[in-house]
From Swiss-Prot:
Catalytic activity: L-serine(in) + Na(+)(in) = L-serine(out) + Na(+)(out); L-threonine(in) + Na(+)(in) = L-threonine(out) + Na(+)(out)
Keywords: Amino-acid transport, Cell membrane, Membrane, Symport, Transmembrane, Transmembrane helix, Transport
HAMAP family xrefs: Ser_Thr_transp_SstT
Keyword hit for Transmembrane: yes
Function of the molecule: Involved in the import of serine and threonine into the cell, with the concomitant import of sodium (symport system).
GO CC terms, sorted: plasma membrane
PANTHER family reported for this sequence: PROTON/GLUTAMATE-ASPARTATE SYMPORTER, SERINE_THREONINE TRANSPORTER SSTT
Pfam family, one: SDF
Chief localization: membrane
Gene source species: Streptococcus agalactiae serotype V (strain ATCC BAA-611 / 2603 V/R)
Entry protein name: Serine/threonine transporter SstT
Family: Belongs to the dicarboxylate/amino acid:cation symporter (DAACS) (TC 2.A.23) family.
Biological process according to GO: serine transport; threonine transport
NCBIfam families, per database record: PRK13628.1
Amino acid sequence: MKRFLKAWRKTSLIKKITIGVVIGLFLGILVPKASAIGLLGQLFVGGLKAIAPLLVFTLVISALSQHREGGKTNMSTIIGLYITATFAAALIAVVVNYIFPLTLILKTPAKTDLLPPKGISEVFQSLLLKIVDNPIHAITEANYMSILFWAVIFGLAMRSSNQRTKDLMQTFADATSQVVKWIINLAPIGIMGLVFTSISENGIGILGDYGLLILVLVGTMLFVALVVNPIIAFVMMRKNPYPLVLRCLKDSGITAFFTRSSAANIPVNMRLCEDLGLDKDTYSVSIPLGAAINMAGAAITINILTLAAVNTLGITVDFPTAFLLSVVAAVSACGASGVTGGSLLLIPVACSLFGISNDVAMQVVGVGFIVGVIQDSCETALNSSTDVLFTAVAEKSVFGKK
């Protein structure tokens, strides 16, 4: 037993997670009614979601309060990369539609009581109102835009504090980070539970009716992750980007795929940034910000499903209109964190460009919820892994260096 525990401790986290995935897969097929196994996944995701807001709040305050005057954080570059990648992903989705035009079977009403926003202005109004939320309420509700806003305010205010106060804040941040490490070490067990739940509840029948749609969605996201993002990274770094790209997909994308939550993956991304030796002053802000606005996967989902609806209804779309759709999708995707239901509930906003009624648009949303088990997992993996990727790319960029 001791030999087994020793070997387990020496095994890398990714290998442990792989073992957990395989065990969860078999248990989901063999004993699908053993619901207690699924509880392990819920506890793992719940733990990550619970600690992530506190982690972001303490890290940002600590980093800003001790930030050196004249220190470079690369935040403008990172935000520029987030926006560029999101728009590029939306544009790629349009091109994919011309190559693989999809149609949908719009006969199942959307099984959701959520109401879509009436337009982009409503999306950003909601986002702005969330920013000025009560800071305590923001932490309890995991409202990261508000958490970031108040953490920045408190961090700047604490710059004039004495060193002992700053050290105390750093101690809180370090203690929170240690708790995060303990939770992440439970990832193999948690992901085993998540895989079990997914297999036992959904099976693999979903691949039959919506196989082509799933293939196009996943294929487009893979193309963006393995081709588009590396091109952007190469332009910025002027060196082979794939070791960094694959490291981010392996260490961040895999956990994000199973948790299906960018918020829950924030602690994982923070740890990866630390392992990559990135500047803490930068990544403590860029990672939670990326979880809120870096939404390449959401832009792909919005465009693919919207254009599939357009094809189904026989509406002709010229490229200038499709380009405008890319702009709308990119802007809407950046506000996805401000909308209950995320990217799927923003589809009616995009559909409105083509005069598609809200009833039809909500049927498209219904299709999105049906394939959401796979679509949402891949979308989150792409979104979350690129938070780390572009934070690292900005720091390693050849631009702005003497």
